[in-house]
Amino acid sequence: MKALVIGAGGVGSAIANIASRRPFITSMVIADRSLSRAQAAVTKVNDPRFSAQEVDASDVNDIRALIRKAAPDIVVNAVDPRFVMPIFLACEEEKVNYMDMAMSLSTPHPTDPMNKPGVKLGDEQFARADTWSKNGNYAVVGMGIEPGMSDVFARYAEDELFSRIDYLAVMDGSNLTVDGYDFAPSFSIWTTIEECLNPPLIFEEGRGWYTTEPFSKLETYDFPDGIGPVECVNVEHEEVVLIPMKVKAKEVRFKYGLGAQFIETLKTIHTLGLDKKEKISVQGVEVSPRDLLAALLPDPATLGDKMHGKTCAGTLVKGLGKDGNPKAVYIYNVVDNEWSMKNYGNQAVVWQTAINPLIAMELIANGTWKPAGINGPEWFPAQPFLDLISEYGSSWHIREEEPKGIVK
């Protein structure tokens, strides 16, 4: 498979590192607005299958030109969600296959944003499904860790473990710390703000999708593998859009284990207006407060050797098991930063994200997954994906939970 990866930040660089160990990749172009950053990712893998290019991910025509030059089987979007639509549209126009790890951005409801959704995550992409089907190409959207592996867990739960799903919550948490920083997100601050400060999206059977105030439904969840209890809140996330489209569940939500200090910091950022995307004039210079904040914080790709701890992504499912009795499980994946740095030179959060598009690409390349049109991870059988996780050096587990309050 010939791949073009757009974005040479933490996730894009990790994709290159992992892909260099997989023979199904015949060639991979790593492209970035900074040619030197793309070249650094290629130099690190030291593999003749890999090359670097420069591209402006906000410019559809520039992306189209690179697609024509690289002639890939698939384009992998490894930049933040602002650039989903330019890359997606460039692939549509060039009739080339596409994969991303985050979907097109949402827009709040114009008059009632804390109760009703406006434009949901991914709506812009799914609105073009007929065109993709007509073109004979595929787009696999939301194929990172969350969304991505978490959606695969949801599909597995329905197929193998449950006869009825009452409650499904993707639960993300970690005990990661960064030396020398009180506040240093391990992922793009632009994306973190977008997820955490937008009204959270929730799905309920019979009601459909609705929204709440940011940071709603605070609960402390005890994460596995020594991570322990972390304060979790509702957050807007793609799984809440994708999972109800293919998995029958009475309730779906995403809860992010941010921790009390992180939550308070984000609230302060919002209070000060530093989360705003729109540019303002500062002494004659036009600048976006969110872009300024991102420039002030450390690049997550550079934090690996300063990070300690583990990160966990998983799906909590409650309902009736295949035997008709109450059942609750947490299906999860944990990555230790010490392990990912030692074996790949990538910090845990970006490595955990990067393996998933590659597993999906391998399943497509060998004909196990057969995407057509626009697809999410839960469109496909889960077991082949889960079987490949161990080949990529990671693992997945099922923890039985107390099935409290589940009525037959």
List where the protein language model places each region.
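Rossmann-fold NAD(P)-binding glycine/threonine-rich loop
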Residues: 101-137
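C-terminal catalytic/substrate-binding lobe primarily of soluble NAD(P)-dependent oxidoreductases
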Residues: 159-408
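N-terminal Rossmann-fold NAD(P) dinucleotide-binding loop
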Residues: 12-13
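Rossmann-fold cofactor-recognition segment
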Residues: 45-59
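Helix N-cap at the beta1-alpha1 junction of Rossmann-like dinucleotide-binding domains, i.e.
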Residues: 33-37
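Conserved Rossmann-fold cofactor-binding substructure of NAD(P)-dependent oxidoreductases
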Residues: 56-72, 79, 83-86
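N-terminal Rossmann-like NAD(P) cofactor-binding module of classical short-chain dehydrogenase/reductase
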Residues: 67, 73-77, 91, 98-100
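Conserved N-terminal Rossmann-fold NAD(P)-binding element of oxidoreductases
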Residues: 3-9
